[in-house]
Design a protein with these regions (language model features):
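Active-site acidic catalytic loop and adjacent metal/ATP-binding pocket
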Residues: 1-33, 43
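Glycan-recognition and catalytic cores of secretory/periplasmic carbohydrate-active enzymes
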Residues: 6, 26-27, 50-54, 60, ...
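Conserved short-loop catalytic and cofactor-binding motifs
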Residues: 21, 37-40, 72
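Active-site activation/catalytic loop segments of kinase-like enzymes and analogous catalytic loops
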Residues: 29-63, 77-94, 106-113
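All-alpha amphipathic helical-bundle segments outside canonical DNA-binding/catalytic cores
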Residues: 65-76
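ATP/Mg2+ or Mg2+-diphosphate-binding catalytic cores
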Residues: 85-136
Length: 136
């Protein structure tokens, strides 16, 4: 879907309906889940995020659950790095500074995903050695 987040969902006749789907594409289902669980605009606890992931995995049986979780974490990190770039561009080019306040939480979401996944070793080292966007 690529634009899958709580703001694009609504209840209609006791079911969840998706809106704003004109840019929908087929892709890894872990991307949409990452968009829902690690939404930079909605702060939730890590335990809440873990519970959502557990419920999702209990409903949809994946042959390789650990691969799905790895995909989920990678896609969450990629998505939030992209969001940081987009919010920075909006502030610099378009003078839309209201999104800058969300950047620290995007970094927190990234940190939460990379801290225990060995596949992020190089990224973790890179981020430790290089300054993060904090102020524009």
């Amino acid at each position: 879907h690529r634009d899958f987040h709580v703001s694009n969902m609504m209840f209609y006749k006791n079911k969840i309906a998706l809106i704003d789907s004109q840019d929908a594409v087929l892709g890894n289902p872990a991307y949409d889940l990452a968009s829902l669980i690690d939404d930079v605009r909605i702060k939730t606890s890590n335990s809440f995020k873990s519970n959502i992931l557990k419920v999702f995995l209990s409903k949809f049986k994946y042959k390789n659950e650990s691969q799905f979780i790895n995909d989920f974490e990678i896609l969450s990190v990629l998505r939030n790095l992209k969001i940081i770039g987009i919010f920075t561009r909006l502030a610099k080019r378009d003078k839309k500074r209201k999104y800058l306040k969300l950047i620290p939480y995007a970094w927190k979401l990234i940190d939460n995903r990379i801290k225990n996944n060995p596949n992020f070793h190089d990224l973790k080292n890179f981020l430790q050695k290089n300054p993060r966007i904090k102020k524009i």
